[in-house]
Amino acid sequence: MPNNLLPTPTPLATLLRMRPLFLGLLGFAFLTSTGISFAAPIANSLKTIRAVGAEGKGNAAAAKAWQSLAKAGADQLPVILAAMDGANPLAANWLRAAVDTIAAREKKLPVAALQKFLADKSHNPRARRLAFELIRGADAKLAAKLIPGMINDPSVELRREAVAQVLDAGKIANQPAIAVKEYRKALDAARDIDQ
């Protein structure tokens, strides 16, 4: 049969043959646009909150931004915690309140991402402490395993628990040599006078 005698496919037939490709592209476009629409408000909210200043400067805008930020999912917790890096104390309070609100609402926290955030010692010490507390609330056994590794942490707040744990080990040691070793280790790492 000659090629010119084949029936010409109708536009509908062509569209039906391309349906999987069309649906895939449509789904990709939807997911991409949705991701952008969620990421943009979070970035804008973080920027607005970080701009809050003394004497109420930016507080009204920060309150609106906080409402938007507090609706974020738990997967955004590391991003919000990272925004505490270099933030002034007022902005850090707004960010901490958003983290607390999200953590209280969400049933499952991104423990692995929080642990990665905690391990990065370049982050704000209070943000890292908050990440640790979130980990402790989600997985107390994991948090207990992390404490000994904080004995030389640059964050005094995180180091304190590790030092306290070593002091306790020295107190319960039955052998004086072990107790002295534990106390020396604790004294080398302690940064607070009361320890």
Segment roles from a protein language model:
Residues A60-A72, N93-E106, K116, R126-A140, ...:
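Structural detector for internal amphipathic alpha-helices that build alpha-solenoid repeat scaffolds
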Residues M1-M18:
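N-terminal secretory signal peptides that target proteins for export/translocation
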Residues S37-A39:
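Boundary at the C-terminal end of the N-terminal hydrophobic targeting segment
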Residues L21-T34:
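Bacterial N-terminal signal peptides
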Residues A72-A92:
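Short, charge-rich amphipathic alpha-helical segments embedded
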Residues N44-A74, P78:
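Mature N-terminal segment immediately following signal peptide/propeptide cleavage
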Residues S45-R50, V79-M84, A113-L118, L146-P148, ...:
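Buried hydrophobic core positions in alpha-solenoid tandem helical repeats
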